[in-house]
C-alpha cells in the first residue's frame, strides 16, 4: 500500500513537471545578453515594491561590461557575471533555503535544498551551483519549487533522529526552521532509522553523528579555512559518514567554528552541552582581548554568568570565525577571581580590608618613595581609559616610568607605522609574497594566520619564514633561524630575495617578540632595507607590518606608555601592576612595595603587598585598539564580582586619597583627556592608518647578532590570567603537550 501510494505521487509529480516546462533555451539565445534581457523585461511586472538584499548580501559592480540582468520572481536584478542563481536571489531579497551552501566555502551542491525553478529548464535546478545567465527568469515560490524542497526535506528527515528536546542545537537549528517552513506535515518512511557511532574530536566539539545530514560543511571548513585535512567523508550510500580516517583529534586552533557552521545538532559545543537554551541567554556585542586581533564576538550570558562566546561578523578583522581560545576561555572568568581589597600581613598571609584602608596604605607608601623609583606596568588586558588614568597618576607623582608588558623597554614608539599592521588584516588578501620575521601567526594571532592561509590557497603566494621551527598550515620556506638571514635577503644574496623582488604586493610581518631582543634596532634596520629594496612601501601600498601579541599594546604606545629608564625595574621601590602578570620581576629589589590591581589571582599576586580587585573586560566598558590600529569597545555583559571596581575608577579614587586628584570622574571626561593625547582612539570601529612611513626611522650602527629568534608564545591556550584560570584551556593545553 505504501509503495503504491509512493508510485502514484511520483507519477503525478512527473506529469506536473512535464506540463509546466517548455523547450530548453538554445545556446545562441543564452549568448545574446541584450536580446534575453529585453525579452525578459517585456514580461516583467511593473511598479514592483523595492526589495532589500538578504543577510547582508552586497553587490559591487565596478565594470558595467561585467554586469548582467536576471529576473527573480519578476524583479529585475543587476549582478556581476559569474554569480550563482542563489546569490542573485539573495541580492534580490529572496531567502533561499540551504544546508550545504556556505558563502565562505566551496560549492558542494549535495543537499539539494536550494532547488528553484528556472524558466525553460526541464526540472528544478540547484541554485547554489547554477551560474546565473543573462535574462534568466528565476522562480523561487512556484508549486514545482515547493514540491521539490518538500521532497528533499523528506529524504533528509528519514534518518534524522527525533532528538530536538535534548539537542543543544534546538532553537537555533537550520533543520528545525526549514522543516517547519518547507517540509511536509507527515512522512512516509516506516523503516528503521540508521545510527552512527560518535567521533572523538577533542574536548571542545561534541559529536552526535546520527544527526548528521552529510552537508560536508565541516569537511570543507577544515580543509579550506582551518588548513587541516582531519575530516573527510567515508563510505557510501546509507553507510556514508563523516569522520577521521584514523581515530584522532581535530588539531586546529579554529576547530570550534564547525559548531557554528553545522546546520544541525551533529557538532555542538562540548563545554556548553546541556547548560542553557538560546532563548534564555542575553547577547552582548563585544570584542575578544585574548590576543591583539580584536575579533568581534557576542557574549551570551544568563544572570551573572557568561555561558558562551560566539563570533560576530566583521569583514575587516575576523570575518565570521574566531579562534578556539576566544570561544572557550570564558569559564576562566569565574575561577580564581579577586573579590575584595587585601593587604599582606606580617605572617605573609593576605587579609581582606576595606577600600578606604587599602587605598590609604598605597597612597602613604607612594608619598614615601622618590618619584624616579615609582614604576607602573599595564597588563595585557588593560583598556585605554585605565592606562590613561595610570599614566596621569604617575606623572602627577613625578614619575615617567610606565610601560605595557610585551612592548619591552625600547619599543618603536616614535612612529606609529613602526608598531601596527600597516597593510591591515583584510589587506593581506592582496599580497602575493610574505616574509615572516620572528613571528608564528598561527599561535600569536590565529585570525591573521587564517587570512594568510586564505591568500596562499587562493593565489599560491610564496611565504618565507625566519625563526624557530614552527607548524604552519600552508606551504612555506623556512629560510633560517637568526637575523643573519635578514642581512642576506637585504643584500640580495638569499634565494628568497627574487621572490620579494618579483612580487607585486610583498608583505613583511615582524613579530612583537623582536622588541625584547638586544639587537632590536639592527633587526628593524635590516627589515627596513629589505622593504626599501623590494618596493614594499609605496604610496599605494604599505606592506611593512608589526604583529603585536596582546590587546593593550597598540593603545599603550599611542598613549605614550614608554619608560624613561630601561633600568626602572631594577631601581624601583614602588611598582604598580595593573593586571600585569607576565612582567619579569626577577631583578626587582626585595624591599620594593608592589601593588597588584587585577581580576584574577595569577602570577602578579605572589609578589604583591596590596591587592585591589578590578573588573574583567566582560564586566566593563572600555576601548581597545587592535594590531592594525582599529579602536573598538567592550561592553559589560555581566555584573562585577564581589567588591571589584573598574580599573580607571580605582586609579581615580587612589589619586584622590593621595592628594593629586585626576580631573575626570566619568568615562566621557576621561575620553576627552584621551582625545588630547591620541584622538585616533576615539574613532571607534574605524581603522586609522599611520601618517608617516618607517623610512623616517634614524639609521643605526648596531649589528645583528647570531642569536636565534625564540617563540613569543609557548602555549597558544594559556597566554593571560583569564585563559590560565580556564579549565577548558587547561584540557586543551594538556592534549597539546601529548
Swiss-Prot record:
This is NADH dehydrogenase [ubiquinone] iron-sulfur protein 1, mitochondrial. It is found in: Mitochondrion inner membrane. CDD domains: fer2 (cd00207), MopB_Res-Cmplx1_Nad11 (cd02773). Residues 281-337 form the 4Fe-4S Mo/W bis-MGD-type domain. SMART domains: NADH-G_4Fe-4S_3. [2Fe-2S] cluster binds at residues 100, 111, 114, 128. [4Fe-4S] cluster 2 binds at residues 212, 215, 218, 262. Residues 1-27 form a transit peptide. Its cofactor is [2Fe-2S] cluster; [4Fe-4S] cluster. GO terms for cellular component: mitochondrial inner membrane. Residues 144-183 form the 4Fe-4S His(Cys)3-ligated-type domain. Its main location: mitochondrion. InterPro entries: 2Fe-2S_ferredoxin-like_sf (IPR036010), 2Fe-2S_ferredoxin-type (IPR001041), Mopterin_OxRdtase (IPR006656), Mopterin_OxRdtase_4Fe-4S_dom (IPR006963), NADH_UbQ_OxRdtase_75kDa_su_CS (IPR000283), NADH_UbQ_OxRdtase_ferredoxin (IPR054351), NADH_UbQ_OxRdtase_Gsu (IPR010228), NADH_UbQ_OxRdtase_Gsu_4Fe4S-bd (IPR019574). Belongs to the complex I 75 kDa subunit family. It comes from Solanum tuberosum. Residues 66-144 form the 2Fe-2S ferredoxin-type domain. Binds 1 [2Fe-2S] cluster per subunit. GO terms for molecular function: 2 iron, 2 sulfur cluster binding; 4 iron, 4 sulfur cluster binding; metal ion binding; NADH dehydrogenase (ubiquinone) activity.
